Amino acid sequence: MLLRTQLFGKVYEFGSIKELLARANEEKSGDRQAGIAAATVAERMAARHVLAEVPLEVLRWYPVIPYEVDEVTRVIQDGVNETIYNEIKGWTVGEFREWLLADTTAGDMIRRVSNGLTAEMIAAVTKLMSNLDLIYGASKIRCTAHANNTIGLKGTLASRNQPNHPTDSVTGIRATIYEGLSYGSGDSVIGINPMDDSVDSVMRLLEMTYEIIQKWRIPTQNCILAHVTTQMEALRRGAPVGLVFQSLAGSQKANEAFGINVAMLDEAYALAQKYCVSSGPNYMYFETGQGSALSAEAHDGADQLTLEARIYGLAKRYAPFQVNTVVGFIGPEYLYDAVQITRAGLEDHFMGKLTGISMGCDACYTNHARATQNDIENLAVLLTAAGCNYFMGVPMGDDAMLSYQCTSYHDTATLRQLLGLRPLPEFEAWLEDIGLMKDGVLTAKAGDASFFLR
């Protein structure tokens, strides 16, 4: 297929689908660093003009990393529903965009079509969307899942209670969990990034968090975000695991840099289904983020947005309870400033929902990025309007272990009140029962961790 157009008297030609996708991407410092970004705004617009005319089937024919050499590609391609794909393969990317945004296209129609898509199709249509398009398109799609409660229901906004501690102090973590719970944070998960990845330390944190959940009869789940092999061993030893976690990348080589592969994830999923203490049927938790493959020198010339879309295609194999992009965590080398972080957050959320997974966002930034807490609050409002399933909850938005800034316990409570949303229904009923919430609003008892020391 000839990938060529003329714009303002200049001819632009692109050598491959991979190159076209990269040139059509919004400005990202990571793509610029990789040497694959459009040289000018005019070239970017020319690439989008060409991309809009590409049939979806061509994007399936030419994945950014060949089927023969990459197991992520194989997972995505082999998972396509061929009946649905055959119905839509003749659509151009531009026609697909118009269909997604049309008032006559409902969320259940999009959920059905998602089963006939590949990651490259999802990435391509995302590149043709404005920020408002991404918000509106994502708002149509509801992706629910269930562990001990149901996430993703219309009218709800969940929060991960993230009580990280620089030394994994059980006393410090317990106090932080209580503070988060007192603000209504923790309905998606009580999830800890451990400093110590050893099995014994992870088991200690699993037992402590499970004890809190059991003592207070909290309708939620726990998760310790250690390497998946550590969690697998903890499961084998009988630890009370609610969700099994792993960070994912969009290429086989990048996942190998993370110390994982599809066979390992398959084994972890099977163990989770057999031994997790949650009711299920969804037991997995994944985190993602644009730029991870580039940081591992494993991008194979593909742009970071397309590789991110491929992560969601891999995640879908495991019917996860929740997935979130950690959108500004890697730093300004990949997303330079608030403009790029905001764009990537909206892109990732839209692509996750279009893939068909329960999607949240860690709206965050590092201290050397050109971003502030106000920018993260702005992104959180936009994502909430887009129907984001959950955010992180960190004391005052400052993670003392990971040394980055994100959303606070207060932020989710404010977003719920601002936009008329509620916690997950089982969790809200629990908050009401213990006196921390009434009619969807926190009571005077909220915000005081000592409430749980009675």
Enumerate the language-model features and the residues they cover.
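Anaerobic metallocofactor- and corrinoid-dependent redox/one-carbon enzyme cores
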Residues: 1-174, 182, 187-454
